[in-house]
Amino acid sequence: MPDNLSLHLSGSSKRLNSRQLMESSNETFAPNNVDLEKEYKSSQSNITTEVYEASSFEEKVSSEKPQYSSFWKKIYYEYVVVDKSILGVSILDSFMYNQDLKPVEKERRVWSWYNYCYFWLAECFNINTWQIAATGLQLGLNWWQCWITIWIGYGFVGAFVVLASRVGSAYHLSFPISSRASFGIFFSLWPVINRVVMAIVWYSVQAYIAATPVSLMLKSIFGKDLQDKIPDHFGSPNATTYEFMCFFIFWAASLPFLLVPPHKIRHLFTVKAVLVPFASFGFLIWAIRRAHGRIALGSLTDVQPHGSAFSWAFLRSLMGCMANFSTMVINAPDFSRFSKNPNSALWSQLVCIPFLFSITCLIGILVTAAGYEIYGINYWSPLDVLEKFLQTTYNKGTRAGVFLISFVFAVAQLGTNISANSLSCGTDMSAIFPKFINIKRGSLFCAAMALCICPWNLMATSSKFTMALSAYAIFLSSIAGVVCSDYFVVRRGYIKLTHIYSHQKGSFYMYGNRFGINWRALAAYLCGVAPCLPGFIAEVGAPAIKVSDGAMKLYYLSYWVGYGLSFSSYTALCYFFPVPGCPVNNIIKDKGWFQRWANVDDFEEEWKDTIERDDLVDDNISVYEHEHEKTFI
């Protein structure tokens, strides 16, 4: 056997499998007679035997208990490092990949279309959605005008979610990885860090809001004056010992659910989806019955705006729905990557989001109107209505009803916190420190930080804080616009997976510079954010800050402005300054759609082969060479 075909069990970093050996042997031997052909077949048999023996030896070595030179090294390798498969690679290579960042293999792609229906049925039942109609009603719209804006707003939301989901459905990628295609390998950390910060803050705020249904459950069991029976030694002017106890109960009860793998968390949403209809319609029927069948819909608004005032009230109500959903649009690939087929996350989301959220908002409107008929006050929060029920009629039936509905609200907040905050934070943290943090650790980090930032102080400081959280949609919409333009217009659905996990020279997504920055994405992002900044500052800043009416109106349209400007400016920049790895020469005139259903079950082997190469320049010769035979969709 020639030397170049011998298999040596040495410390070489190059890996050689049987297929590569046989390909090498095909180049070395060119049998042109019977004797040479016999020798060739004999050599192939020897190769196979040696490869088998090598494999057996490696399995035996790997099964032996590893030896560490010190106790601290054992701690480091056994408990600090989360992905042992990337121990032998460089620091930069380990940043590219871990088990939570890799494309989702077939075994974990278990979400069918009905799982997405259950997911959104579960998501629509939360405290924020019940109150979303208050924006339009307080601006002067009547109930049916407000409901129309909700249908339209969530219709747009459904479309944006479906667009953002597509890259996850086809290539099985999470947002931190898919954003590398548009922002660049390393500059993609900017939107990722944005999501981490917002996820932690929102997790903390949502957990603090969930303290109220926990409080209602406790009062249903131990008495409506329970908060007066617990001495206040907390030492904070913004929260009592009782309030912190309720917050901590919810926070601690959430921790086990943070350890559930993302592809299995669908079971939580299935359970939640079963409970939600009973709680929603049960609450509505109960409220109407207590109001003796009367609903004071006319009490929901005082004045009716006309002309341009009505138009802007209509638009602001519509935009409130979209801003409320800005985080979930960005998060869409984190869930769509688990879909069984490309269409599992398509029609189910496009139809369910506007339908389910609009029904929930209508129930919220009717419960508020029934509450006014009973108490003469518009309680926009459903929890305030339940609190009033408990305080005015403390009997067995009321206690049981309040407990059950509050329990569903608490479960709803748990599901929302996982889907919108902890899971996205865990996924993003695993992209920042893939060697040391996986989704479970990232989710627990999110929960720990949520406790540390003391949300009761944030919520008590000013209503400006909650405004700032909602207004942050101007930054998220600009990210979503860039990602959408890059995938659908510039790349026409084409992603080269080996390149998106590589920082080597020639990787499409390094954009020709060692910093992995796509300057077009940065410029487009700033174009989307800049027009809305003056209005944002005026809305969340000091009362003395004044801006023009035009600046405020741009801010009211922030989601459309941010998304539209970033989308169009990125498309224009890529037209004049083409990006690498684009399957068409002219992104405006050329036609074609190059998305494919990626087979990624053996992707780890492909990735390891890729990082052993000095560069990927040869891959730039043809976009289609290795994947043209795959099925395009």
Swiss-Prot record:
It comes from Saccharomyces cerevisiae (strain ATCC 204508 / S288c). Belongs to the purine-cytosine permease (2.A.39) family. This is Uracil permease. PANTHER family: ALLANTOIN PERMEASE-RELATED, NCS1 FAMILY PURINE/PYRIMIDINE TRANSPORTER. It is a multi-pass membrane protein. GO terms for biological process: nucleobase transport; transmembrane transport; uracil transport. Gene3D superfamilies: Hydantoin permease (1.10.4160.10). It is found in: Membrane. It comes from the Eukaryota. GO terms for cellular component: cell periphery; eisosome; fungal-type vacuole; plasma membrane. GO terms for molecular function: nucleobase transmembrane transporter activity; uracil:monoatomic cation symporter activity. InterPro entries: NCS1, Pur-cyt_permease, Uracil/uridine/allantoin_perm. The keyword rRNA-binding does not apply. Keywords: Membrane, Transmembrane, Transmembrane helix, Transport. Glycosylated (possible); but there is not yet direct biochemical evidence for it. Transport of uracil. The chain crosses the membrane at residues 143-163, 173-193, 197-217, 242-262, 268-288, 310-330, 350-370, 400-420, 442-462, 465-485, 521-541, 559-579.
